[in-house]
């Protein structure tokens, strides 16, 4: 439901990454920590990490959502579902009472396992390595480390999706 196919040539576009919000338009969603379906939310939401900068928080989540959509397309399950399926119970967000920083190393360990599982679901060697790297950059469990490495020096565009979309296109 997130990919629209337009014609007999199968031209397609990503159509939805969650509930939309814009700083220039008044909305009840602007004050929410996360506006989407919790089933697909990124790890920082589960563990109550809150980035006060709206743009930074929202764009980091957008990165994760795009990576999760790509994961779903190839693995048949979202990144969030994969991470939670491998998370040891004592570190599951419903049980965990510590901070996001305290659970981060466990998230990264599980993320490594999930990436290996994702890799096994990609058929075809032509784009496999690039696709894996793309998902790693988009879905890093630490929102501060998400995004394309070439964007890391661009303070306003750290989470820009343009480089990723160019790769996918």
Where are these predicted regions, by residue range?
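Conserved C-lobe activation region of Hanks-type protein kinase-like domains
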Residues: 48-124
């Amino acid at each position: 439901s997130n990919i629209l196919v337009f014609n007999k040539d199968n031209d397609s576009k990503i159509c939805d990454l969650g509930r939309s919000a814009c700083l220039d338009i008044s909305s009840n969603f602007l004050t929410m920590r996360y506006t989407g379906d919790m089933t697909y939310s990124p790890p920082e939401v589960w563990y109550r990490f809150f980035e006060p900068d709206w743009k930074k928080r929202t764009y980091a989540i957008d990165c994760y959502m795009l990576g999760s959509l790509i994961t779903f397309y190839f693995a048949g399950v979202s990144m969030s579902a994969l991470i939670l399926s491998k998370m040891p119970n004592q570190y599951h967000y419903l049980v965990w009472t510590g901070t996001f920083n305290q659970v981060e190393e466990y998230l990264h360990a599980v993320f490594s396992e999930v990436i290996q599982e994702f890799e096994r679901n990609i058929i075809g060697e032509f784009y496999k390595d690039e696709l894996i790297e793309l998902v790693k950059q988009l879905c890093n469990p630490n929102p501060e480390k998400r995004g394309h490495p070439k964007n890391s020096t661009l303070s306003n565009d750290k989470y820009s999706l343009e480089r990723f979309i160019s790769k996918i296109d």
